[in-house]
Amino acid sequence: MLFERNKPYTQETLLDKENILELIQFERFCRDNALWDSMRTCFAKDSHVNISWFNGTGEEFVSSSEAMNRYAPHQIYNTQMWFNNHRAVAIMQATIQFRVDIKNVEMQLDSDTKIIYCLEKDNDDVWYISHLSCIYEKDKLTPVIPTTINLPNSEFSEYRESYACLSYALNELGYDVNHDLPGIDRPDEVNKYYRQLDKWLTEKDDDEEEKH
């Protein structure tokens, strides 16, 4: 089902699509604008988030983002999604952005990523995020004001190619980084993750089994 062309939308699925798009864009909007209480309403109670600097529940992710206290806006591009009854997977193409001082130079971090959302609709037909993760693609660090800075390649040798600059910048801020997340430098792992998403999307949960 994942990556197959969607069937023509019905009125119901079109409404689901718009509600999901509103939800995930609102979640990122809240993150970018420090709207922490509103951001919490986007996640299911048993949700899970696993990204470069964080692994835990949705509630903990919001609290940790608040504690980070750093402006890190997202440039959002296209989003594709697939449905199966009350479950959906949405893939949002985005660029993570923030500024960090490195060796007394203000640097701009741009990290291209696919943000992966697993979503579920409750009995009141309200969608919530049940899982959030990323597939990392490429990134860069550039001086905010044109200047020269010496960052030897050796300082990046321990990092993954798909999110080396992001990892470096987060380490500079004092955050540990998970180096075993999906990234396009490990295509087999990305494909494995896609298969896991497809399995989750297409399998029936206990609630569905009880209805049949």
Q: PLM features: what roles do these ranges have?
A:
Residues 74-76, 109-115:
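Short, surface-exposed coil-to-beta transition loops
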Residues 12, 69, 105-107:
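Outer-membrane beta-barrel proteins
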Residues 89, 113-165, 174-176:
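Short beta-strand edge/turn micro-motifs at domain boundaries
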Residues 1-29, 33, 41:
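Short, low-complexity N-terminal intrinsically disordered segments enriched in polar/charged residues
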Residues 97-109, 138-142:
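Short, cysteine-centered beta-strand-loop-beta hairpins and adjacent loop/turn segments enriched
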Residues 36-98, 203:
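A solvent-exposed, acidic/Ser-Thr-rich amphipathic alpha-helical stretch
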Residues 151-212:
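A hydrophobic membrane-anchoring alpha-helix module
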